[in-house]
A protein has these predicted regions:
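Intrinsically disordered or highly flexible coil/loop and linker segments, enriched in small
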Residues: 45-49, 86, 136, 140, ...
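Sequence-structural signature of the catalytic-core scaffold of metal-dependent phosphohydrolases
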Residues: 1-23, 27, 40-46, 75-78, ...
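C-terminal subdomains that position terminal phosphate/3'-OH groups for nucleotidyl transfer/ligation
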Residues: 248-400, 412, 432
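Glycine/alanine-rich phosphate-binding loops at beta-alpha junctions
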Residues: 15-68
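Alpha-helical phosphate/pyrophosphate-handling elements in metalloenzyme active cores
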Residues: 59-90
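Acidic, carboxylate-rich catalytic segments that either coordinate divalent cations
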Residues: 1-22, 366-379, 390-432
């Protein structure tokens, strides 16, 4: 079990003990348990219930949303973390936060906002901004510290510990902090000697891939967009493997071999015959449970074996036990498990996200975001919520004011964005 220090539990704004306890009661929770609770009770997390995962939140009876996906990632993260001796609350919290910065319409909305945002838009960087600025919890002399999470918690939530712009002026496609948040990133990364994310963030990222690949395929099967019979269609499978290797890395042969291993699982064969009967629903749920357990077990076992084989690589003055944790150690994902996850992700992308109807819907979604951005920027601060009006007033440059509008739109649910788009269209029609 890794021993976390007072340095790991430090918060940007110091906090004393709570003063509202009933007489003779006391606070038993640790710092990371409090971090987890703050995220769990946040409005930003609740808003994910009305944000797209693969199919929209209103497609079908029980589709996954960004919120349910985040809960599943959090559970998987906790399981892997416990197996590796990491703090389970910290790992679970990282899973809860991993999509909290996503705007309406998921990656499609992310791309649209990136087109209009001076300084770029990235869901992971927006996560840090929400946790450290936008989600109201801790205010000191009119300065917002967001949820005021611990150093280790913010570090665990940051899987891309980079700013958008590098010292040489080049830019990163994926990054965990906007340039204006560089000081916050430096604070949470203090003590790191390389550019790798901490163990807890690695666990979160892996858990996201597992949940995404398994559960999104499950949703695709239920919606009728996916059938696992494709794993037996060698012609279709070959084309699928080529596209998957191009999109997610590795080779087509690795994905074809992964399909062969999956075909050998009885639960895959049962789920391939899904027909909405009670037995089919049970078979599908058995499959998702088995696959999650298959990949969690593979990752945990491989990582622990690597630690046992080379404990001296982790042992130092700051980590005398040589345990895995924070900046000590790397997650090991076996090649076979990684290939199977890539194959399942490919199935989800090609048979759900790249369907013509889905692509046409994405075009309409982008148009809404552009329309709302133009409307809110033109009428700001009056078009902004009260809290964002305050951010607007405090902004000193056009770029900062534009960022406030982007923050407002990114915080919206999809339902609210669509109402705002209708309002913006009405105003445009009136002005024409």
């Amino acid at each position: 079990m890794f021993t976390y220090s007072a340095f790991d539990a430090e918060r940007r704004a110091p906090e004393g003990p709570k003063g509202s306890q009933i007489v003779e009661s006391f606070e038993e929770r640790g710092a990371f348990s409090r971090d987890r609770a703050r995220v769990l009770h946040s409005a930003a997390l609740r808003r994910l219930a009305d944000k797209t995962q693969v199919v929209g939140p209103r497609d079908g009876d029980t589709p996954r949303t960004r919120l349910t996906h985040s809960l599943e990632v959090a559970q998987i993260s906790r399981g892997i973390g416990e197996a590796l001796g990491l703090d389970p609350d910290l790992c679970e919290m990282a899973g809860l936060t991993h999509d909290i910065g996503h705007p309406p319409y998921g990656h499609n909305g992310e791309n649209a906002l990136n087109e209009v945002a001076r300084g770029g838009f990235e869901g992971n960087a927006q996560t840090l901004r929400i946790l450290t600025r936008l989600e109201p919890k801790k205010l000191v002399d009119a300065t917002s510290y967001g949820l005021n999470l611990t150093r280790a918690a913010l570090d665990a939530a940051c899987k891309y510990p980079l700013t958008r712009t590098n010292p040489d002026g080049s830019t990163n496609r994926k990054y965990g902090a906007y340039d204006e948040d560089a000081a916050i990133l430096a604070w949470l990364r203090e003590g790191h000697t390389d550019a790798a994310p901490p163990m807890e963030a690695q666990v979160m990222d892996c858990s996201d891939d597992i949940a995404y690949s398994v559960h999104d395929v499950e949703d695709g099967i239920v919606s009728g967009r996916i059938t696992l019979k494709v794993l037996w269609d060698l012609v279709e499978l070959a084309a699928l493997a080529e596209k998957g290797a191009k999109a997610f890395g590795g080779s087509a042969d690795e994905l074809i071999d992964a399909a062969a291993r999956l075909r050998a699982l009885p639960s895959i064969g049962a789920a391939a015959d899904f027909d909405y009967t009670l037995a089919s629903w049970a078979s599908l749920k058995k499959l998702t449970s088995e696959l999650v357990g298959r990949y969690v077990g593979a990752v945990a076992t491989a990582t622990m074996q690597a630690e046992c084989n080379h404990p001296e690589q982790l042992r130092c003055d700051d980590n005398p036990s040589g345990a895995l944790g924070r900046r000590f150690g790397s997650l090991v994902i076996p090649a076979e498990a990684e290939a199977e996850v890539r194959l399942l992700k490919t199935v989800a992308v090609l048979y759900v996200m790249d369907m013509p109807a889905h692509l046409r819907r994405q075009d309409r979604q982008r148009d809404r975001i552009f329309r709302v951005y133009d409307y809110m920027l033109a009428g700001a601060p009056g078009t902004l919520d009260t809290m964002f009006q305050q951010w607007w007033t405090m902004a000193s440059t056009d770029a900062e004011r534009e960022r406030v509008v982007v923050d407002q739109i990114a915080s919206m649910t999809e339902s609210r964005l669509e109402r705002a788009a209708k309002k913006a269209a009405g105003v445009a029609g009136f002005m024409a």
